[in-house]
Design a protein with these regions (language model features):
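Catalytic cores of the polymerase beta-like nucleotidyltransferase superfamily
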Residues: 1-272
């Protein structure tokens, strides 16, 4: 983490002693993977920060007090109490700690303010549920994420993970491809069981989507992320191998011709 950002957050905590602030998610995950497996993937373009206080207050404090920056913009997303900062080409997402409740499979969750431990419980995989808390310089690892990084395994956090948000399946394939990790047997069995049962129902929707509107957006966002990767064919192959390719389209037939077509798409895209 940039030294001036670390110092600025530390100053904020000194002035707000009852507020906990932590780094969480991909920044911590990739740093640990780099250290444990001596694999150079740690090139942070973004940092996720969670606070038990107001995300807006923390963001405004950083913007006002951080030194030696070229640019600092704030975008607020009120619905989830999150703020995006851009500092010297580094994107910083600040969120107020929250817990989520899905009233029906795939619907956008109802959120409530929570503490850091509860916030970690809402995340997708154990390797993304590791946090570093500033004031006590403490590591939160409630779900053995460090152990799973050592074992190179992807573990879902709970039994309803895929039912709540099946876009996590696509993210799982991205992580498996990019990091060289494998999905745990228990997580794979959950995924196959839920996809086969297909609990996501559309109510009063005029589109042709097979998912509720909010979930359709999350699926498209994950597909957009896939398209950025050079290993698009490998990601599709993984979903097919895991027998959950129907999450994309029930009529997809993945064969060598199909995979060659995906590789050509990536090559053509690279020429424009």
């Amino acid at each position: 983490i940039p030294f001036n950002l670390f110092n600025t957050i530390s100053e904020y905590i000194e002035l707000n002693s009852s507020v906990k602030v932590a780094i969480v998610g991909g920044y911590i995950r990739d740093l640990l993977i780099t250290k444990i497996h001596k694999k150079t993937i740690f090139n942070p373009l973004d940092i996720d920060i969670v606070t038990e206080g107001s995300s807006v207050d923390l963001a405004k404090f950083i913007k006002k007090n951080i030194s030696n920056v070229e640019l600092c913009l704030i975008k607020e997303f009120e619905i989830y109490d999150t703020v995006e900062l851009n500092i010297n080409d580094l994107k910083i997402d600040i969120a107020s700690a929250r817990k989520e409740n899905y009233e029906a499979p795939g619907l956008n969750p109802i959120v409530k303010h929570a503490n850091i431990e509860e916030d970690l419980k809402r995340r997708d995989f154990s390797i993304n549920a590791i946090a570093f808390e500033f004031s006590k310089q403490k590591i939160y690892d409630l779900f053995d994420g460090i152990k799973h990084i050592q074992e190179k395994e992807l573990h879902l956090l709970h039994e309803n993970s895929i039912q709540d948000d099946p876009s996590r399946l696509i993210r799982c394939a991205r992580y498996a491809s990019r990091l060289g990790f494998k999905i745990s047997n228990k997580s794979l069995q959950q995924s196959q069981r839920i996809v086969q049962r297909w609990p996501w129902h559309i109510i009063n929707d005029d589109t042709k989507s097979r998912f509720p509107p909010g979930l359709s957006i999350r699926i498209r966002m994950e597909l957009s992320e896939i398209y950025k990767y050079d290993n698009l064919a490998k990601i599709i192959s993984l979903l097919n191998h895991w027998e959950i390719i129907s999450i994309l389209d029930k009529n997809i037939k993945v064969n060598n011709k199909f995979l060659r077509g995906l590789k050509w798409i990536k090559k053509l895209k690279g020429n424009y």
